Amino acid sequence: MATIGFISLGCAKNQVDCERMMFRVQEAGHTVNEGIVGSDVVVINTCGFIDSAKSEAIDYILQTAALKAEGQVGKILVTGCLSQRYQGDILQEMPEVDGILGTGSYTKIVPAIEQLLSGHKVVDFGSIDAPEEETGRVVTTPEHFSYIKIAEGCSNRCAFCIIPYLRGKYRSRQLDDVLYEARVLAANGTKELIVVAQDTSRYGTDFPEHKRLLPELLRELCKIDGLHWIRVHYVYPDEIDDELIDVIASEPKIVKYLDIPIQHCNDKILSTMHRRGDKKLIEELFAKLRTRIPGLVIRTSLIAGLPGEGEEEFQELCQFLREQRMERVGAFVFSPEEGTPAATMEHVDEEVARERAQTLEMIQSQIMDEYNAAQIGKTLEVLVDGYDEEQEQFYGRTYADSPDIDGRVWIASEEPLHEGDFVNVTIDGCIDGDLAGYVTEEE
């Protein structure tokens, strides 16, 4: 049996794919290495979504190739979106790579590894539209929180996005399969479950009944013992209906936090980018959400420099950001992706787009500072994530913060805390976008 190392790049959905491959490898009797040095095969599960992700993936491949040249690792197998996107080009441009699997071939990870170990190259690209095969996972997040992917692929076909070409059409997992996995995760210590897909709001709409099943799924997840927080990401504005709002508002386990990617607010740009809905829909939705779900934290993503964005359209976006005061915003520079309709459209100057993204970040920074200042004096429930040796402090997150992408709460405590503890923290300060406070018994 062999020792297999894994590197997972990109989003949480990619991480789940990697965890499933790890499970298959272990089930076949191989050992999953904690690092990569000493591995007989290194699997690099890549992201190829935008230019920066492609560059990161290539850097990791080259770094691993350097270790291979030194004899510190054996074979290199590249999987994920970069391999799906560039296929044979990877082997041609990087001969150090021994094999590639597309996004439709994750289930073939074990035979691919065994083929590599027998001295053969591997190239396998299965159908990206095939139903996902259910399997276990080797969870790589801290024990107390886990991601659960409820669907694969995307059928939205936004003009700027390459994902449907890499991941195939939208395919929901069966509800019972999702619930079974969630129960296993909870039994193994998961307290915060983070629901992800390319578009969680369309869960179930590809089944014969064409019914939105996210509300039903969330209600069933709330019945699982051990789960304390359930967080929902990637909900599209045109699919948020009253039933979903009612479930989020009424279920105590569902944190009052929604990740709603809007990308822009200008009607002309939304139409050109093949986004359903318009500015009026978004504004009315946000107003309804704020009214129906008190304390709701809205996260979104915005893209600066989309084709057709002149100064007038950009200023409209800035004003929208100031008026809507979304608590969490990721601002990105438009990246023209070959093979997408937007790549052939007239582009905004790259430097102008970069400056616009920085402007959005500055506006949002002020909004976040004001939001954080408003938390001072409040006692908030915080999930402890760990201890920072350098800061000599525990840290965690409130319901307003998703792992890795949002802020932290620095916790002063006279008693030792443990990862996965829920504690009440009275906020007494703000530090570089994070909150700070002390443990209190106050509810």
Regions found by a protein language model. Name each.
Residues 336, 344-443:
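Terminal RNA-binding accessory module
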Residues 158, 178, 195, 232, ...:
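Conserved, mostly hydrophobic/aromatic
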Residues 244-245, 317, 411-412:
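Short beta-alpha junctions and helix-cap segments that line functional grooves
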Residues 76-80, 85, 90, 187-312, ...:
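Conserved SAM/AdoMet-binding glycine-rich loop
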Residues 4, 41-42, 146, 193, ...:
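Conserved beta-strand core positions
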Residues 7, 196-198, 233-235, 261-263, ...:
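Generic beta-strand/beta-sheet core signal
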Residues 1-203, 243, 254, 258, ...:
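Proteins enriched for Cys/Gly/acidic motifs involved in redox and nucleic-acid/cofactor modification
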Residues 256-257, 270-271, 282, 294-297, ...:
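Extended hydrophobic-aromatic, low-complexity segments
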